[in-house]
Design a protein with these regions (language model features):
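Redox-cofactor binding/interface segments in oxidoreductases and associated redox assembly factors
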Residues: 46, 115-116
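Short flexible/disordered coil segments
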Residues: 100-115, 132-134
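Surface-exposed, charge/polar-rich loops and edge strands
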Residues: 15, 108-113, 122-125
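Membrane-associated lipid acylation/remodeling enzymes share a hydrophobic transmembrane-juxtamembrane segment
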Residues: 123-134
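N-terminal active-site beta-alpha-beta segment that forms phosphate/nucleotide-binding
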Residues: 1-106
Length: 134
């Protein structure tokens, strides 16, 4: 059932215009930036948006010199966290998603996580991609 739901909602998301996705990205990150948890966070782990996902690169670029930004790197089917200080540290990795070139993995505490999703229900429950990374 989840597999069919994933497929259905990815198809629907892919139908959204680029202008709408840009608007939604801006709105979502405005909400995050105004949240007290974000304001207090020193270490933020965020996925690097891909395809029709919410565009995270502008957010990363905005905050990379103001907070410690960590992004995922997949290695042997395991998601690892890597601290980046520049977008130049990213290169195309698994599934065509930008990943850090560094293999210096972080295993400490993170203050805030921005998680990818295919869809959320009205109660805030998330349907992800089913890889078990998040």
């Amino acid at each position: 059932m989840k597999k069919e739901l994933r497929k259905k909602f990815i198809i629907e998301r892919n139908k959204l215009s680029e202008a709408y996705r840009d608007y939604a990205s801006t709105k979502i990150f405005s909400i995050i930036e105004n949240n007290e948890l974000f304001k207090l966070a020193g270490k933020v782990f965020i996925y690097v948006g891909f395809g029709s996902e919410i565009a995270t690169i502008p957010f990363i670029k905005k905050w990379i010199n103001k907070k410690q930004i960590f992004v995922p790197k997949i290695d042997n089917n395991t998601m690892n966290l890597v601290h980046i200080t520049s977008l130049k540290e990213l290169t195309e990795g698994h599934f065509g998603v930008l990943e850090p070139t560094s293999c210096e993995y972080f295993n400490g505490n993170i203050d805030l996580v921005v998680t990818p999703s295919i869809v959320f229900d009205k109660n805030g429950y998330r349907l992800g991609y089913g890889k078990g990374y998040y």
